[in-house]
Structure formats: structure tokens, C-alpha cells
Amino acid sequence: MAKQSMKAREFKRKKLALKYFLIREKLKKIVKSKFSSEKDRWNAMLKLQTLPRDSSPSRQRNRCRQTGRPHAFLRKFGLSRMKLREAAMRGEIPGLTKASW
């Protein structure tokens, strides 16, 4: 089970990423555009660097919804492998069956 502070930190990162998403995209578009001047690119880079570090989506970590575990996370279900197995054995995930051959 992950610490509550780690879960809260991830929640804060998601909120910041949503808050600054449009600003970040606009600045990145200016930086990548071949039609913008060097001065505009430079200013956009400086503004990007002044944004909060946690507002970048690459700082986020996928975590299990039930336990907050960061490793062995399965995107399709939003759970870690252990919690997915437990839920599958209880029959809580429709269409998911244990493999046998």
C-alpha cells in the first residue's frame, strides 16, 4: 500500500498538468514552429522553464486505483497485477477468465 502522501502528490501533479495544459501546448507550438522568430522561440522556452515542474505530464506515474502501487500497473484496468488477479478471481471483471490450455 502506497503512502497517502504519495497518492496526494500524484493527485496534485494531475491537477497541475490539467491547469497548465493549454499554456504548455501553446508555448511548445511556438518553439516547434519554423515560422516563429528566434526571439519568440527563446521567450517561449524561458516561459516554459518558469512553469511548475509538476505541471509536465511526464512527471506523472500510473498508480493502482486501489492500493496506489506504482509498479506492475495494467492500464486497461487501472489496477496492479495483484489487485487485478484478486478481482478476476472474485468475478468482478466481466469477460476476464483464468487462462487454461
Curated annotation (Swiss-Prot):
One of its GO terms (biological process) is translation. Keywords: Ribonucleoprotein, Ribosomal protein, RNA-binding, rRNA-binding. It holds the Pfam family Ribosomal_S14. GO terms for cellular component: cytoplasm; small ribosomal subunit. GO terms for molecular function: rRNA binding; structural constituent of ribosome. Part of the 30S ribosomal subunit. Contacts proteins S3 and S10. Belongs to the universal ribosomal protein uS14 family. Binds 16S rRNA, required for the assembly of 30S particles and may also be responsible for determining the conformation of the 16S rRNA at the A site. This is Small ribosomal subunit protein uS14. It comes from Buchnera aphidicola subsp. Cinara cedri (strain Cc). The lineage of its organism: Bacteria, Pseudomonadati, Pseudomonadota, Gammaproteobacteria, Enterobacterales. The gene is rpsN.
